[in-house]
């Protein structure tokens, strides 16, 4: 899907990757960018409309829906990462509330508009979706669950004409990764890679050097092969033996 002349909604849009995604959508000719945020928005482009949107707040989600007449692309970018050691269930729940359930609630709320436009859902996931980072296990758990949700949505929404893209994002130089001494890309580079993948129709998008090290193993591996076979059941009603070797 080309971004030019499209209406794009981005959650978590006031800083980091979200802010960069807003700018990149504008650079690619988006007709309108809806910037979902809990804080102030610095972008003054007339094509940008700020939406007060905490993805854990049902009333804010509904108010946002009421303000949007049409939508082509939903980018579920809002997320949190809290240091934990699996001893604090509250920390794990906070990750799930934002990174998993918030994503699902926003998707459900805007799905009628996306179905009408035959649009796209872009879920910002993480390399920790496939390989946990033990320093932030709650984050890794939530992102792994969000990957599974993305795969399920992809199969279930195909018949409605809605494409679902999962972004396997590596480390980006933002507030979220400030305490980690690891290679990072700029938010702008990540945003460009994400939109490249969307415009090229990639189901799973690997937008940075770290995530691209996983490409061959992921796309040619048994996990992706199994996903395709399961999707065949949903799309075609095919009867397959799941015990059969891949």
Spans of features found by a protein language model:
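Conserved glycine-rich cofactor-binding loop
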Residues: 14-15
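Residue(s) in the substrate-gating loop at a strand-loop-helix junction
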Residues: 126
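A hydrophobic alpha-helix adjacent to the NAD(P)-binding/active-site core of NAD(P)-dependent oxidoreductases
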Residues: 50, 95-96
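Rossmann-fold cofactor-recognition segment
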Residues: 45-58
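Conserved mid-core segment of classical short-chain dehydrogenase/reductases
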Residues: 79-94, 135-138
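Active-site helix of classical SDR
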Residues: 96, 107, 142
């Amino acid at each position: 899907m080309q971004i030019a002349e499209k209406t794009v909604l981005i959650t978590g849009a006031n800083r980091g990757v979200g802010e960069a995604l807003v700018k990149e959508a504008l650079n690619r000719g988006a007709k309108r960018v809806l910037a979902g945020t809990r804080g102030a928005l610095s972008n003054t482009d007339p094509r940008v409309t700020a939406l007060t949107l905490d993805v854990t707040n049902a009333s804010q989600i509904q108010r946002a829906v009421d303000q949007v007449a049409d939508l082509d692309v939903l980018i579920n970018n809002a997320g949190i990462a809290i240091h934990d050691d699996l001893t604090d269930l509250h920390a794990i729940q906070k990750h799930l509330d934002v990174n998993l359930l918030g994503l699902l609630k926003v998707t459900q709320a805007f799905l009628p508009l996306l179905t009408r436009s035959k649009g796209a859902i872009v879920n910002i996931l993480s390399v920790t979706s496939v390989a946990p980072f033990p320093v932030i296990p709650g984050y890794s758990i939530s992102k792994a669950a969000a990957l599974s949700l993305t795969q399920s949505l992809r199969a279930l929404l195909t018949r409605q004409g809605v494409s679902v893209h999962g972004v396997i994002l590596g480390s980006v130089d933002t507030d979220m990764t400030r305490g980690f001494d690891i290679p990072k890309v700029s938010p702008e580079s990540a945003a460009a890679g994400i939109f490249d993948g969307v415009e090229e129709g990639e189901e799973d998008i690997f937008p940075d050097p770290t995530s691209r090290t996983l490409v061959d193993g992921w796309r040619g591996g048994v996990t992706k092969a199994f996903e395709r076979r399961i999707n065949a059941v949903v799309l075609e009603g095919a009867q397959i033996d799941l015990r059969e070797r891949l």
